[in-house]
Amino acid sequence: AGCQGLDLAQAPVAAVQLSGVWTVDEEASDDLRAFTRPPSERRRPKLSVQEEIRRIGLGSGLAFVVQDFQIIDAQQIVIEQDRDSMGVKHIPGTYRDVTWGDRERDIWRVQAGWQEMDLVIFSTAKGLRILERYQLVNPNRLRLDLEVQADGVNRKLTRFFDRKRRAGR
């Protein structure tokens, strides 16, 4: 999937309200263990002993992605959406701020914006590509599709979150 130069808009085609407290639906979501499992030996290029030692020493790109993209294993997220940005508190985890447009964040080049009604965040670094798509299935159900390219392997993960109803509603 050639995602270079994603055509992302500064606003969705119609109002999309992502703000709120969202709790993961484990049953409906993909299994994280399958996502983080090393690729089967036959799919991974054969490495010499030295290369294998170096790979282990460097740590896997996927492990780095899981650490840096806490949406992958957050149990709950709190989203504060503005016109041109979004803040996401990951529980457990840290706070992440995303501004629409093109930005550099640490080692990442981040493109964020809208495709129709979906919020898309595309992050690239050396040998790593992460595509996140936030999609409201209905006003109280959020689907998150992740495509991760790391360690020469493509992985996909889909997670579902339900909006927490405010007390007394």
Positions of predicted regions on the chain:
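PEST-like low-complexity, intrinsically disordered acidic/proline/serine-rich tracts
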Residues: Q4-R169
